[in-house]
């Protein structure tokens, strides 16, 4: 009898964590933020970072210690870096050095923020903008990265699941569920709330340092699609992790990146992909404090789908 009850409980748990393509499509409407900040809004959940929220975040600075959350750009080609940084130097007779960069930042080795025009669904962008009317070869006529030019400053919470699970890193393909994040809240004595930035450390860079590069775009630990209603309920303003956000493979037929689709298009939630959270994880563990002030800004490229960023944590 006990065995049957256990099997039943396991079955219910697995069922609760199974998300279908139909559910993802339904969430596009059910958890949508379209119209929440007006029909012309182009900032999405960044609206949740109010002046009061910024002032509260400043109180988290106690020591003035700052840590970068960005991965240093790489010039070598690897399985997770098929399009490495290009740098062309120019030296003139006057002794000045200049360079031209070629950066394919929408990948899995360059820390970058996604603008809200980066993803679409059924011909529409966040807040109902029509893709065919707003996106062309010359850029995004709405929802471009220039809408973030005033910068982002808020409270950030680091979720360090390898620490919670007492492992050096999560294996590729490991999904992260709401129960994992809530277990972390209890462990770290934090409560994730409105206007917060939420950063997930999977230990991707620790695994890479030990075992070498692999194709993170095809196989990575990350958020499970079932996190999306949770993100909406908690009113997360900014989402990031050290991989490509979505667990890969997603496990959902015809929905390879449900986190990207739902976060960007339905919620208007900007994403920071490919963060390097190793140093900040060490600083947090040293202090037994997993909340801090985070600041960042993207270069306001008109109509840009995103830009490389260097988020800074300050304790």
Indicate where each model-derived feature is located.
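Basic side chains
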Residues: 2-3, 201
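Sec-dependent N-terminal signal peptides
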Residues: 3-12
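Active-/binding-site microenvironments in catalytic and ligand-binding cores
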Residues: 17-315
């Amino acid at each position: 009898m006990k065995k049957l009850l256990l099997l039943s409980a396991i079955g219910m748990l697995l069922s609760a964590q199974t998300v279908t393509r139909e559910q993802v499509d339904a969430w596009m409407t059910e958890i949508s933020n379209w119209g929440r900040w007006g029909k012309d809004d182009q900032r999405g959940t960044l609206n949740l970072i109010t002046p009061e929220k910024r002032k509260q975040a400043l109180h988290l600075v106690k020591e003035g210690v700052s840590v970068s959350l960005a991965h240093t750009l790489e010039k070598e080609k690897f399985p997770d870096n098929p399009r490495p940084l290009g740098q062309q130097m120019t030296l003139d007779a006057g002794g000045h050095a200049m360079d031209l960069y070629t950066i394919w930042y929408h990948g899995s080795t360059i820390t970058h923020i996604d603008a809200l025009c980066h993803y679409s669904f059924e011909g529409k962008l966040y807040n109902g903008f029509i893709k065919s009317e707003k996106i062309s070869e010359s850029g995004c006529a709405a929802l471009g990265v220039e809408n973030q030019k005033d910068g982002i400053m808020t409270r950030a919470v680091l979720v360090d699941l390898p620490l919670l699970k007492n492992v050096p890193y999560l294996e590729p393909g490991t999904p992260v569920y709401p129960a994992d994040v809530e277990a972390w809240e209890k462990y770290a004595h934090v409560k994730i709330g409105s206007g917060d930035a939420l950063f997930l450390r999977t230990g991707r860079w620790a695994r890479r340092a030990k075992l070498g590069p692999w194709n993170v775009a095809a196989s990575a630990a990350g958020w499970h699609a079932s996190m999306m209603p949770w993100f909406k309920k908690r009113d997360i303003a900014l989402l990031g992790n050290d991989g490509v956000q979505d667990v890969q493979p997603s496990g959902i037929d015809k929905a390879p990146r449900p986190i990207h689709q739902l976060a960007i298009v339905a919620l208007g939630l900007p994403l920071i992909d490919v963060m390097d959270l190793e140093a900040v994880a060490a600083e947090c563990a040293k202090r037994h404090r997993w909340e801090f002030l985070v600041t960042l800004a993207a270069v306001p490229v008109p109509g840009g789908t995103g830009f490389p960023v260097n988020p800074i944590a300050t304790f």
